[in-house]
Curated annotation (Swiss-Prot):
Assembly, per entry: Part of the 13-subunit RNA polymerase complex.
Biological processes annotated in GO: DNA-templated transcription; transcription by RNA polymerase I; transcription by RNA polymerase II; tRNA transcription by RNA polymerase III
One MF annotation (Gene Ontology) recorded for this entry: DNA binding
One Pfam family per UniProt: RNA_pol_Rpb6
Annotated PANTHER family: DNA-DIRECTED RNA POLYMERASE SUBUNIT K (PTHR47227), DNA-DIRECTED RNA POLYMERASES I, II, AND III SUBUNIT RPABC2 (PTHR47227:SF5)
Transmembrane segments: none
Main location: cytoplasm
EC identifiers of the protein: 2.7.7.6
Native organism: Sulfolobus acidocaldarius (strain ATCC 33909 / DSM 639 / JCM 8929 / NBRC 15157 / NCIMB 11770)
Enzyme class, first EC level, given as a word: transferase
Protein's recorded name: DNA-directed RNA polymerase subunit Rpo6
Family, as annotated: Belongs to the archaeal Rpo6/eukaryotic RPB6 RNA polymerase subunit family.
Functional description taken from the UniProt entry: DNA-dependent RNA polymerase (RNAP) catalyzes the transcription of DNA into RNA using the four ribonucleoside triphosphates as substrates.
Length: 89
């Protein structure tokens, strides 16, 4: 298999999914924003916990985060993916 074929297989399988590393990065970045005083994008009154990580996880789960993931492939190609359009929240 060539590297281009491997890249195509990866893109097809992960086009609408986030890796565990991307999820961790998104949640940690949003939790940092919340801890620095950013307003939550969801109503936090009915959440079990009011810590910033729980709020960030719920925002990701509901798909309200205006964050874009930049994936760089081994061949140098760059793909931008909006978190709002991802299926596996």
């Amino acid at each position: 298999m060539t590297i281009d074929k491997i890249n195509e297989i990866f893109k097809e399988n992960w086009k609408n999914k986030l890796t565990k590393y991307e999820i961790a990065r998104i949640i940690s970045a949003r939790a940092l924003q919340l801890s620095m005083g950013a307003l939550p994008l969801i109503d936090t009154s009915n959440l079990k916990s009011d810590d910033v990580i729980s709020i960030a996880e719920e925002e990701l789960k509901r798909g309200v985060l205006p964050i874009t993931i930049r994936r760089i492939y081994p061949n140098g190609q760059v793909e931008l993916i909006s978190v709002r359009k991802i299926e596996n929240r």
